[in-house]
């Protein structure tokens, strides 16, 4: 085999990434260069995290056989992380589902029956009966859907349209509720628009990086490689890492800070105080572009109303705020002194001062990065608001090399869950169901009767669990996620609700996950390049890919499932007479006719596809479905700062960052010369707000919902590891990744282990007030908790860590706090 220099470098990149994780490289990855004539290559975004790396997918004889980093992709520039190099193997687990499976007994559906193969016709027959019965007897609030930040853009759009316009139910929510909802509400409160204003190009221009509750070395390794390159290429560049335990990102840190859980709120207010006390406020920017408001406090913890913490809260769930003066804000943060902050956080004073100095130095361009440490937090929205405060006080925002940046964990948590509006309270392009004008815009564009979309916010993720247990939500369709394993407090509401005979649960998934095996009907799903798709990453980059192979057996894409199921319902079966009277021409039509086969959606012919191009859904329907749905959806954002490019542009590019105006993408929003919506002379304009000004919020420290006590004496924090993604339903089916980290462990401080007579490798029972798991003690390795805290990853189906977690949420975002609950350990 003869290797070119470029091919040699690619092969070495694979080997280097594998070696860094202690893994062997599959032969197919080593040999890809020599097989280029035999393998067909096409581009796609990676299937895993929200970084949005570009990969080249190699297919041969109807299978994905190879994958390499796309050297033309601006995000990763040809490099993959270890999960990315093993992408081909995620699709070929031995237990891949290839036909629908229904619980049956004596030849028919039974809640306690055994999973039995059925046809799609039989599966849809049962689903249709369950949906129609619930709609007739209880109405739209009795049905619901739990979707995903892994849906393609048109899958999420089709799901939202089917439920909100078709079934007239806002009970649709994505698993992004568990990871990005606090970021969404934080952006909306401060800026009036969602998603970061900066981009990854900031990395090469920044002078300092501050990680707030983000282990980028393992969770966003490609971005971390760029930060590492920037840090090592300039001795003046600084990195600060804040976490409740030490992890791999600390290895690069100039200032590694371990703080007491929940005290990040204190540290953030201290830095604001430091900026003011040291005259580091950018007065010109602040005066022209910022308002000040004091937020409501004592807002509860998103628990059931009967919980003592909710009863005790003075303003449960309040998003209220009132204007305040700068002097009032100055007095508010003045309480967060260095002494008080050091005492509450456990962080040495010199480290706190070093951190504050990064933000206060007018000559340092600072990027703040965060992920789940901020967002999965009972005051996650506040944490987001408070970090924005630091950038707004100093004017370090919306310019190259500086700004706040919320990183995402799923490939299209931004592009689908957030931008499309698959949350229970949202509509496309930052619109919301509670706004009559927004509903009217959607109804007119979709050409459905006025009043079709309900004004009431639907059930969010945790509320869905509670409604299932309470018998109020009776038909529940789960797509593209494994929430039985990933969601909080499994045994309290979710498992009882799923197995309640009153309820019918459908799970669409490629594999028999914990969720699938807990359901009543499993629908086999096409994966990744087995369908045409689009994702939107963390830097507002929308990326397309084409279908490159067919799905195995009878597996079908989520889009196919949604669109085909809509054929089962006529308008008079789901809409009241008052609505039909407005548009009598819709009588007798199916939801497919009204939502998906409309002139707007079906106007793009199959001739726009190349003759040999795979596209199973479109070829079955007779029109280019994906293009029709995308163009209909993109209309919502064009003209007011959410502009997406024409459909075809994305197939010809390595992604484009919105707003895309006159063919040009936007790297930095809200600043003159960078954002087409900021006019000459305005300098900055935060145009999501009516007056064009961003908001600094005064928000205090409030304690966690649950803290260690005499009985449950340790904090538990949960999360991920490099080798596995979320619940491991894909990565654990890759032998190399599974063998690299085969089972979950409890990372614990050696002194905490010694005090409990535990040694490395011992079996240990981890218990909370909600449940228990048996795990293995780990006193060494990549994660090094302080005394008083343990860390556990949640990928292991044999150790359902969410048996332990509390379903407390941020009352504003409804996002769960997976980082803080109390546990105890006992040797087994």
From Swiss-Prot:
Endpoints of the signal sequence:
1-31
What's in the GO CC field?
Answer: membrane; nitrate reductase complex; periplasmic space
Top-level class of the enzyme under EC nomenclature: oxidoreductase
Q: Which CDD domains match?
A: MopB_CT_Nitrate-R-NapA-like, MopB_Nitrate-R-NapA-like
Q: How is the cofactor bound?
A: Binds 1 [4Fe-4S] cluster. Binds 1 molybdenum-bis(molybdopterin guanine dinucleotide) (Mo-bis-MGD) cofactor per subunit.
What is annotated about its quaternary structure and interactions?
Component of the periplasmic nitrate reductase NapAB complex composed of NapA and NapB.
Protein name per the record: Periplasmic nitrate reductase
Lineage of producing organism: Bacteria, Pseudomonadati, Pseudomonadota, Gammaproteobacteria, Enterobacterales
